[in-house]
């Protein structure tokens, strides 16, 4: 049976929320968008379009994976970091959001200190 895209998002939000996924609506939207390989614009403008049974089943499988605790990045094998997508799998740690902040601050301050001798210490890396 073909469902509307927005219905799948609602169903996904409900299932994810009931399984304890934080920010379930965001994750449901992300899973649907990534499963269908849509750009943000395509995703936004296709909310009232019907999705094929095959696509719907793929989305549902990905929702189920997420309810089992599998991160979205591991479901799709990709993680965005600093505006780039990196391939990830079960053997790779996902970059943390605060790491992006550290990179941004380093780049921002690099030109202020580039002629000075500095020491860096990186703690807690795998």
Question: Which functions belong to the PLM regions below?
Answer:
Residues 47, 57-126:
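SAM-dependent Rossmann-like transferase core, predominantly class I methyltransferases
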């Amino acid at each position: 049976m073909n469902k509307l895209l927005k219905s799948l998002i609602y169903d996904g939000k409900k299932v994810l929320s009931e399984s304890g996924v934080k920010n379930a609506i965001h994750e449901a939207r992300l899973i649907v968008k990534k499963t269908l390989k849509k750009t943000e614009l395509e995703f936004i403008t296709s909310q009232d379009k019907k999705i094929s049974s095959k696509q719907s089943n793929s989305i549902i499988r990905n929702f189920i994976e997420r309810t089992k605790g599998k991160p979205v990045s591991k479901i799709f094998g990709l993680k965005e970091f600093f505006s780039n997508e990196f391939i990830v799998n079960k053997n790779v740690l996902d970059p943390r959001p605060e790491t992006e902040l550290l990179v941004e601050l380093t780049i921002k301050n690099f030109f202020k200190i580039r002629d000075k001798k500095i020491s860096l210490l990186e703690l807690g890396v795998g």
